[in-house]
Swiss-Prot record:
GO terms for cellular component: bacterial nucleoid; cytosol. Gene3D superfamilies: Nucleoid-associated protein YbaB-like domain (3.30.1310.10). InterPro entries: YbaB-like_sf (IPR036894), YbaB/EbfC (IPR004401). This is Nucleoid-associated protein MXAN_1931. Homodimer. It comes from Myxococcus xanthus (strain DK1622). Keywords: Cytoplasm, DNA-binding. One of its GO terms (molecular function) is DNA binding. The lineage of its organism: Bacteria, Pseudomonadati, Myxococcota, Myxococcia, Myxococcales. It holds the Pfam family YbaB_DNA_bd. Binds to DNA and alters its conformation. May be involved in regulation of gene expression, nucleoid organization and DNA protection. Belongs to the YbaB/EbfC family.
Length: 105
């Protein structure tokens, strides 16, 4: 197409990719927290969906009912990962202008 500078678009795409990758590195240092069972299980994840810590209140531990604790841990982990995903999507949308870039955003 006459008048279209493809090199310009490629440079812009590369800059956008660099900004997104830089922001992802920053997100790795950020934390989100989720709780389950009235706060008896707390999970902290970073901004790139890695679990950083799991804390379990003593009251949540019942040797006769391990399935309840398993359910609380599962719920808290899933909530932390969902919160982390949403946080990452919001932050990357700020950079990409809301455009979904496969494999990046």
């Amino acid at each position: 197409m006459p008048g279209v500078d493809l090199n310009y678009f490629i440079r812009q795409a590369n800059k956008l990719t660099e900004k997104i990758e830089e922001r992802k590195q920053q997100l790795a240092e950020e934390s989100v927290e989720a709780k389950a069972g009235d706060g008896r299980v707390t999970v902290v994840a970073n901004g790139i969906q890695e679990i950083r810590s799991i804390k379990i209140d003593k009251e949540a531990i019942d040797p006769n009912d391990t399935s309840m604790l398993e359910d609380l841990i599962t719920a808290a982990v899933n909530a932390a990962l969902a919160s982390s995903r949403q946080h990452m999507q919001r932050e990357l949308a700020k950079i990409s202008g809301g455009v979904k870039i496969p494999g990046i955003t």
